[in-house]
Design a protein with these regions (language model features):
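Short, surface-exposed connector motifs at secondary-structure boundaries
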Residues: 30, 108-114, 174-179, 250-254, ...
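Alpha/beta catalytic cores of nucleotide-metabolism and tRNA/nucleoside-modifying enzymes
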Residues: 1-19, 232-253, 257, 263-322
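N-terminal capping/small domains of soluble enzymes
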Residues: 2-114, 120, 295
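Conserved strand-to-helix beginnings and helix N-cap segments that scaffold or border functional pockets
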Residues: 49-50, 126-127, 191, 289-293
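Alpha/beta enzyme core
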Residues: 121-257, 265-270, 274
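Short gly/pro/ser/thr-enriched loop/turn and capping motifs at secondary-structure boundaries
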Residues: 66-70, 148-150, 212-215, 286-288
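Hydrophobic faces of well-ordered beta-strands that scaffold small-molecule active sites
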Residues: 36-39, 59-61, 114-118, 141-143, ...
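Acidic-and-aromatic substrate-binding clefts and catalytic sites of carbohydrate-active enzymes
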Residues: 44-46, 124, 287
Length: 322
């Protein structure tokens, strides 16, 4: 991305480059010291060997189910132009093992909000995980509604208004923590899904999840992934994420965690300008584990260059076309 031309309209009347930036944000009543979190599926405790995770605004876990999930057969990762396909299959240790083995290490980091991402194969499974995690000291729950509904022939929960509403409502009833609903981009009208989640009791939204894609090896004449299809992530989907965040911000008054191809501080600022309150970093962290911290530093630089003193000020400064 390139720095805007100097003759572009300035969104701020003045700035003080020496003033300390206010990077804090509040998502559904939970204060983050800055707007950067990890995207679900891309963070493990091994990141502690690469950087101080306490510098993050929040940490988002891998998907947590009622019982361990083995994940899909290999190969389940494939590179593409502008990103990658993954069909890991939400492999996880199950909620009891996660609570016993991983939560204490995260909880030991002072001032770091923990967002527990939950997955399920039925509405009842989602509700059970939400209820169990609500008994712990996680700070927020993120509902991944891109999982296939085994009772409805494998249709993803998040691709119909009815599925979004029913799943969100059930989890909202079971959860005693602020609830973020993670929206799928594999829909015709994402604003309809956002409204359904809001109507069912979501406290915040996160978007976008991965786009469904496929890769074929033309010389072997075989589909690359054992699962055939996978979720496309990386810089290639970033413009789609920006567009969807922009649309959802104008349709629903809930806080938004924007994600999708965030590789730089400029990418993060772009999502905030589109209407996100916070930003999740995913694929970039798979390439270099400390990417979230680098992107946070770059976001500071962008804000100073354009004169935004706070994340809120940046979010409210988009110059719309005449």
């Amino acid at each position: 991305m390139h720095e805007p031309a100097q003759n572009n309209p300035a969104p701020f009347h003045s700035s003080d480059s020496g003033k300390e930036l206010d990077l804090s944000v509040e998502i559904a009543g939970v204060r983050w010291k800055n707007p950067i979190t990890t995207a679900s599926g891309t963070f493990t405790l091994n990141a502690r060997a690469c950087y101080d995770i306490g510098r993050l605004g929040a940490v988002t876990t891998k998907g947590i189910a009622t019982v361990p999930w083995p994940g899909n057969k290999t190969p389940r990762i494939a590179e593409t132009y502008g990103g990658m396909l993954n069909a890991v299959g939400l492999q996880n240790v199950g909620m009891e093992a996660w609570i016993r083995d991983e939560l204490p290490a995260l909880r030991s980091v002072p001032g770091l909000p923990i967002i527990a991402n939950i997955v399920g194969k039925t509405v009842e499974e989602y509700a059970a995980v939400a209820a169990r995690l609500s008994e712990t000291d996680v700070d927020m729950i993120e509902l991944n509604i891109s999982c296939p509904n085994v009772k409805e022939g494998g249709i993803a929960f998040g691709t119909t208004v009815e599925g979004v509403y029913a799943t969100t409502a059930a989890v909202r009833k079971a959860a005693k923590k602020p609830l973020i609903v993670k929206l799928s981009p594999n829909v015709t009208q994402i604003c309809d899904m956002a409204k359904a989640a809001a109507d069912a009791g979501a406290d915040a939204l996160s978007l976008i999840n991965t786009l469904l894609g496929m890769k074929i090896d033309v010389y072997r004449r075989k589909v690359v992934l054992a699962n055939k299809t996978g979720g496309l992530s990386g810089p290639g989907i970033h413009p789609i994420a920006v567009r969807m965040v922009y649309e959802v911000r104008r349709a629903v008054p809930l806080p938004i965690v924007g994600m999708g191809g965030v590789m730089s501080g400029e990418d993060a600022a772009e999502l905030i300008l589109a209407g996100a309150d916070a930003v999740a970093v995913g694929t970039a962290a798979l390439l270099t584990p400390d990417a979230p911290i680098r992107i946070l530093g770059e976001l500071r630089t962008v804000m100073r260059k354009i004169g935004a003193a706070s994340v809120r000020e940046l979010k409210n400064s988009l110059v719309e076309p005449a």
